[in-house]
């Protein structure tokens, strides 16, 4: 499973990139708004750091508007992926983008049927939202398993991005259940490194070494 980072913060992206684990970035209007910067300028900055997929979301709700926005976003850099909501109008736009060779990430996926529809429309990625499903008492991880099974049975090449990741357990379980990618907030990404026994082991090795000097 690959790691994307879910942020529009340049320092977070730079740090994750320096770690050598970053395969891409996902953004959304809310994340960009927090940064108080021009959307297009921030995308240019991100794509200058990251060579993998960078998801940029359209804000129009009709297919013609999404297509117009998406085509402009795609001009920013060749690794821009157009993020489109899981709606009938969104899938019309996905089909149009697919025919033009523009990559797409269908977001706000909450059912396997939605994921299948998005894949058949030509989506490069589908993004089921684990945390938001958990919030309403549904099993987001079970959804990952179901989508992965359906895609495997039918030879569908659309990749599954586990999104709305809340904690490290989501990452482990998404990997076990067949997600191709986890898009992870910076805070959770850093938590993946941590274990008290790792820290204790380092301290012991250093103490043992220093005693011999």
Curated annotation (Swiss-Prot):
A GO CC term assigned to this protein in UniProt: cytoplasm
Keywords annotated in UniProt: Cytoplasm, Pentose shunt, Schiff base, Transferase
Places the protein is found: Cytoplasm
Pathway: Carbohydrate degradation; pentose phosphate pathway; D-glyceraldehyde 3-phosphate and beta-D-fructose 6-phosphate from D-ribose 5-phosphate and D-xylulose 5-phosphate (non-oxidative stage): step 2/3
GO molecular-function terms, A-Z: aldehyde-lyase activity; transaldolase activity
Keyword Cytoplasm: yes
The protein's Enzyme Commission number: 2.2.1.2
Pfam families noted in UniProt: TAL_FSA (PF00923)
GO terms of biological process kind: carbohydrate metabolic process; pentose-phosphate shunt
Residues forming the catalytic site: 83
Reaction catalysis annotation: D-sedoheptulose 7-phosphate + D-glyceraldehyde 3-phosphate = D-erythrose 4-phosphate + beta-D-fructose 6-phosphate
Recorded superkingdom: Bacteria
Record function comment: Transaldolase is important for the balance of metabolites in the pentose-phosphate pathway.
Family: Belongs to the transaldolase family. Type 3B subfamily.
The name this protein goes by in its record: Probable transaldolase
């Amino acid at each position: 499973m690959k790691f994307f980072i879910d942020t529009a913060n340049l320092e977070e992206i730079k740090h994750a990139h320096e770690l050598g684990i970053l395969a891409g970035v996902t953004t959304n209007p809310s994340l960009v708004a927090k940064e108080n910067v021009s959307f297009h300028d921030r995308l240019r900055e991100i794509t200058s750091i990251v060579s993998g997929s960078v998801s940029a979301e359209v804000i129009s709700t009709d297919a013609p508007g999404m297509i117009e926005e998406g085509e402009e976003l795609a001009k920013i850099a060749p690794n821009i992926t157009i993020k489109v909501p899981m709606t009938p109008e969104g899938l019309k736009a996905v089909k149009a983008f697919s025919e033009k060779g523009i990559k797409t990430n269908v977001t706000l996926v909450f059912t396997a049927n939605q994921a299948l529809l998005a894949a058949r429309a030509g989506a490069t990625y589908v993004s089921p939202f684990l945390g938001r499903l958990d919030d309403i008492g549904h099993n987001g991880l079970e959804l990952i398993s179901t989508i992965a099974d359906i895609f495997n049975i039918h030879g569908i090449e659309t990749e599954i991005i586990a999104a709305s990741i809340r904690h490290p357990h989501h990452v482990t379980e998404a990997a076990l259940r067949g997600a191709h990618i986890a898009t992870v907030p910076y805070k959770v990404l850093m938590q993946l490194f941590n274990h008290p026994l790792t820290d204790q082991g380092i301290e012991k090795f250093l103490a043992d070494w220093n005693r011999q000097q």
